[in-house]
Amino acid sequence: MEERKPITHITAGLVIAGLVIVFAIITNFLGLTQQKSLGFLQYLLIIGGLMFFVNQFGKANNYTKSFGDLFAFGFKSTAVFTSLYIVFIIIFFLLFPDIKEKSLEMARQQMEQSPNVTDEQIDKGMEIARKFFWVGVVGGSLLVFVIVGAIGSLLGAAITKKQPHNPFDQPAV
């Protein structure tokens, strides 16, 4: 078989982060952040990217990697793109504070639509949302991306062909 240079998890993470960041910028500036289906599209983009890169990693290693090796590659890629995305989202909200205010206002509107919530509860909820905004953004992004990354890594490792070397098949010396 021909010798292939394996792709690194850093490269895979950078490419996926780039795709997700471009997608986030486009949806924010086009005002499409309220559409839930686009959020799911972002997760499918991550899962599809991980499956592609895990498969390419297996292919570059002549499919000799085990399920655990392939999953680890995908999860390390997840760590890279999650870290980059969190840095991006912090910088993005600092550069565009109006987007933070719009997201808080959307949260207020959703609370106002609920008939069981009083104005006092809405004000208290908004106070808490403002106080813990950064914890919610960073923690929420971290949690969701790690879960989605684990799913993508599992699927990528599962669909990649595996022909690991058996250590007992080595010729005697």
For each predicted feature, which ranges?
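Short, charged juxtamembrane terminal tails flanking transmembrane helices
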Residues: 1-6, 161-173
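Alpha-helical transmembrane segments of multi-pass membrane proteins
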Residues: 7-15, 72-84
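Membrane-helix interface/capping segments
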Residues: 56-70
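Functional transmembrane-helix hotspots
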Residues: 88-114
